[in-house]
Design a protein with these regions (language model features):
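Short histidine-centered beta-strand/loop micro-motifs
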Residues: 20-24, 33, 41-46, 64, ...
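Short acidic-glycine-tyrosine-enriched beta hairpin
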Residues: 66-82
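Short, charged/polar surface micro-motifs in flexible loops or helix N-caps
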Residues: 27-28, 37-39, 57-60, 84, ...
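Ligand-binding loop in jelly-roll beta-barrel domains
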Residues: 82-105
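Short, conserved beta-strand element in jelly-roll/cupin
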Residues: 34-36, 47-62
Length: 105
């Protein structure tokens, strides 16, 4: 069994988003996204993976189909097809932190 404490591994940069690898196995990757206020993750996808997004702290905006946007908030979880391009942005004053699970299909 492996164990991590978020406050021990979180890292924020005012210049770019940071993905902190937490756990990796043959089929699964677990990452902690640390997105400082005012930053945006460049558009990207994870082909061949199913992806869950679980916001832990702060809020961020995620563009979705048809030009709509959703607000990612703690207490919610989202499933994203890894082939879909996504790029969360944090226009808010508080830093944003999100747990990302990538599960190989």
């Amino acid at each position: 069994m492996e164990h991590k404490v978020f406050t021990d591994v979180e890292r924020f940069s005012r210049e770019k988003h940071i993905h902190v690898p937490l756990f990796t196995s043959e089929r699964t990757k677990v990452l902690l996204l640390c997105l400082s206020a005012g930053l945006t993750v460049p558009p990207h996808s994870h082909p061949g993976f199913d992806t869950t997004l679980q916001p832990l702290k702060g809020e961020a905006i995620l563009p979705v189909d048809d030009g709509k946007e959703i607000t990612l908030k703690p207490g919610e979880i989202y499933f994203v097809d890894g082939a879909m391009s996504f790029n969360p942005r944090n226009p808010f004053e508080e830093d944003f932190e999100m747990l990302i699970h990538l599960i190989k299909r």
